[in-house]
Amino acid sequence: MGRGKVQVRRIENEVSRQVTFSKRRPGLLKKAHEIAVLCDVDVAAIVFSAKGNLFHYASSHTTMERILEKYDRHELLSEGNNVIEEFPELEGSMSYDHIKLRGRIEALKKSQRNLMGQELDSLTLQDIQQLENQIDTSLNNIRSRKEKLLMEKNTILEKKITELETLHTCIRASPTKAAAPPACNTADAFVPNLNICCGDSGEPETVTAPLGWTSSNNGLPWWMLQSSSNGKS
């Protein structure tokens, strides 16, 4: 006859319960490890003893924190899906979108904290490498943008310098204005030489004003007055 089915129920004796827990706990964690390795899945096992002691296991390629975060996101999405199954008319509504986006928001906040160098203890080596690559890419983009802005600023400054040099060259090359001749204060400031008579040889004779002559004699030129005096004599 085969062995009958063992009924699973709470062990009444406290000592027996503790002994049974100590014997079966390693087997539970071992089974969790085996299924994680054989099936390449994320497995997490959390056990608290009757005295409050914690025993846990997480797949070697991840951490307990990341598995719990994935669990929380899944629960949020499952909650939204359950609401839609019960109330299909809510699909696409703000309530459904809010429920569905809560997990994404939490994941983005976590990623942002990691980028700021916070809460890194829960990251694996692979996560750290991915985070480092993201930071390097961000720094390269920032440097490229900075260099572009500096080049644009230098171009503007060079253009202004060229304009100033051109203006300076034009000012230096422009001719200076000639000084205006002094104005004559009297009508006799310029006394012309007039050929108005002939000498004994018949050649024109140049007649000039006598020394000390002024225009005070009735405002007439000296040669007219001289002609008048000669006629009288």
Curated annotation (Swiss-Prot):
Keywords: DNA-binding, Nucleus, Transcription, Transcription regulation. One of its GO terms (molecular function) is protein dimerization activity. Disulfide bonds: none annotated. GO terms for cellular component: nucleus. The keyword Disulfide bond does not apply. GO terms for biological process: positive regulation of transcription by RNA polymerase II; regulation of transcription by RNA polymerase II. Residues 1-61 form the MADS-box domain. PANTHER family: SERUM RESPONSE FACTOR HOMOLOG. This is MADS-box transcription factor 20. It comes from Oryza sativa subsp. japonica.
